[in-house]
Regions:
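Glycine-rich phosphate- or other oxyanion-binding loops that anchor nucleotides, phosphorylated ligands
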Residues: 2-132, 140, 144-147, 156-162, ...
């Protein structure tokens, strides 16, 4: 996923294996459970710890710059953040910002699926830009940086696939629906 950095130590071109998200969207209809049974699925740990571990070790083995974990604040696109929003996100300690990690991660959890996100830092968000140290975000820069990292992403995924465990491994993701339905 293409993301913007909210922290100066997370640089353009770095990778982040995301482990949390903040939903700042106004999207509706982001559940598979619209009744008649009420279902509350926990997203306390929304990304798969097994896949995240495989992604992290693979990226490190390839010698690529990676950050272990990070919180992505998902905003309503298509506009980028204002400086005020970006400064707030940064002060909250969140790491990255994008427009697409939600609802995919929540929907995967509702299906008891393992889900991993490898984020590519394509730009610095408006708050860091306001500090004067970096250039403002542009669509051209985002596309250029993501395209430059596409080969690395393909290499990472190809290296991860044979490491993904079979159904005999008891991953916590498989139990996401245990006790979630209220009948």
């Amino acid at each position: 996923t293409a993301v913007g950095s909210l922290q100066p130590d997370i640089k353009v071109g770095d990778l982040v294996v995301t482990d949390q998200f903040i939903d700042r969207t106004r999207r509706g209809g982001t559940t598979f459970f619209n009744g008649p049974v009420v279902t509350h699925v926990s997203t306390a740990d929304p990304y798969c710890p097994v896949l995240n571990g495989i992604a992290l070790s693979t990226i490190r083995q390839l010698g690529l710059p990676v950050h272990d974990g990070g919180t992505c604040v998902v905003i309503e696109g298509p506009r980028f953040s204002t400086k005020a929003e970006s400064n707030w996100f940064t002060r909250m300690g969140w790491h990255t910002v994008n427009m697409t990690q939600y609802p995919e991660v929540a929907l995967a959890r509702e299906q008891a699926m393992c889900y991993c996100n490898i984020s590519v830092i394509t730009d610095y968000d408006a708050g860091l830009v306001a500090e004067g140290a970096v250039e403002p975000v542009s669509n051209e820069a985002v596309i250029k940086t993501f395209a430059a990292n596409l080969k690395n992403l393909v290499t990472i995924i190809e290296a991860m696939i044979p490491q993904i465990p079979g159904p005999d491994v008891d991953c916590s993701c498989f139990h996401a629906l245990d006790g979630a339905a209220i009948e």
